């Protein structure tokens, strides 16, 4: 059986990166092994083959040493393990991981596929110009570069990736774990709104809460409640965003309407989907330039469950949320339009049911983890058949197909 190494120059695996795990387990024709730096949540994301390099703090000890060696582009521990395992394909997750392993690609003879996810395109090259130079070398050495959607693909090409090497490979979800359920509520009853994500500026949570406050003013007597799943990661930026969120709750006197559950495992998030009527996800481009890159996987899961999604025309979100069909889209930062659309959804239970049904269809057609696994297998095979980097599977998209 052919071997694919999934390499991530960071910990395997944060609870919010379940979308990466879906890529590991849905290509059964390839044996999967993980290379990483430290581990967490192994009970949630079990994997039979795993090699952790330099586990520990990134500021001292083995973790710091491994980080320094990665920066040279010639980490001897990584080189030794690649020599032992002799993989057919290395699938690097995030741009820096691709660069760190790319120096071994020719001498070890593996195909190198690198997936970009957002921050590695939108922020890293801007904040640290050396990454533009490093990406140039990666684009020369690597075989294929995968992104979630056409918007992200264009950004990758702007960074210098050859267009023929940049492919759209969607992030799928396990449909058997997210069942469809129509939310049939009586008109005039309480409408429950769900937000989910880390407290980062790009998530737009302050805009979401402001929209709720404005909606209550637009339609007196409307009953809205909000559940927030997520929290600050403890960083300075995360704590600042948390204070902005709490400030909006206080400003619009939403204390009695908002429940904050903190971080929750994915199973708890999925359970909460069925207790709510509208998924609110108004992503924005952060002041740092950070953005979603593609689209939040939580939007895909919410749509799969049969819930309409209210979001923004941000990155590749329009590839999931079809305005007026599976939910509504408004411009980034337009809280007035967001509030108006929220009132519209809250006032029309039958429209919510119809949009939820259409959302499920879109997810089944385009975001089934098993189908995306088939596509990923085809990508791997195209790179180990003697024509690495010169041929792609016929069904892999270079740009968005119209619905």
List the predicted regions and their residue ranges.
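N-terminal subdomain of nucleotide-sugar transferases
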Residues: 1-49, 397, 403
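Nucleotide-activated donor-binding/catalytic signature segment of Leloir-type glycosyltransferases, i.e.
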Residues: 239-267
């Amino acid at each position: 059986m052919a071997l694919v190494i999934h390499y991530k120059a960071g910990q395997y695996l944060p609870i919010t990166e379940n979308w990466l795990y879906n890529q590991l387990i849905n290509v059964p024709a390839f044996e999967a092994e993980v290379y990483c730096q430290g581990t967490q949540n192994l009970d949630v994301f079990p994997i039979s083959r795993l090699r952790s390099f330099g586990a520990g703090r990134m500021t001292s000890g083995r973790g710091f040493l491994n980080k320094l060696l990665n920066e040279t582009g010639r980490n001897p521990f990584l080189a030794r393990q690649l020599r032992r395992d002799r993989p057919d394909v290395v699938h690097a997750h995030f741009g820096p991981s691709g660069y760190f392993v790319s120096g071994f690609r020719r001498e070890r003879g593996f195909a190198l596929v690198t997936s970009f996810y957002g921050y590695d395109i939108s922020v890293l090259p801007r904040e640290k110009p050396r990454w533009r130079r490093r990406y140039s070398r990666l684009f020369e050495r690597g075989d294929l570069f995968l992104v979630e959607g056409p918007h992200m693909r264009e950004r990758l090409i702007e960074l210098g990736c050859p267009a023929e090497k940049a492919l759209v490979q969607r992030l799928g979800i396990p449909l058997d774990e997210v069942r469809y359920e129509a939310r049939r509520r009586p008109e005039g009853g309480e409408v429950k709104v769900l937000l989910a994500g880390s407290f980062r500026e790009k998530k737009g949570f302050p805009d979401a809460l402001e929209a709720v406050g404005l909606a209550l003013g637009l339609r007196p007597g409307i009953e809205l409640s909000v559940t927030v799943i997520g929290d600050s990661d403890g960083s300075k930026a995360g704590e600042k965003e948390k204070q902005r969120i709490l400030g909006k709750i206080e400003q619009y006197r939403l204390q009695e309407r908002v429940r904050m559950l903190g971080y929750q495992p994915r199973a708890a998030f999925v359970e909460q989907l069925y207790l709510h009527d509208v998924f609110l996800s108004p992503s924005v481009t952060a002041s740092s330039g950070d953005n979603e890159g593609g689209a939040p996987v939580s939007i895909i899961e919410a749509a799969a469950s049969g819930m309409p999604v209210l979001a923004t025309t941000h990155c590749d979100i329009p590839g999931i949320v079809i305005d007026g069909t599976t939910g509504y889209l408004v411009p980034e930062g337009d809280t007035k339009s967001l509030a108006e659309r929220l009132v519209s959804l809250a006032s029309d239970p039958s429209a919510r049911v119809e949009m939820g049904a259409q959302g499920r269809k879109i997810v089944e057609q385009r975001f089934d983890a098993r189908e995306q696994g088939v596509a990923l297998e085809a990508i791997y095979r195209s790179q180990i058949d003697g024509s690495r980097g010169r041929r792609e599977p016929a069904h892999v998209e270079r740009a968005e197909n119209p619905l």
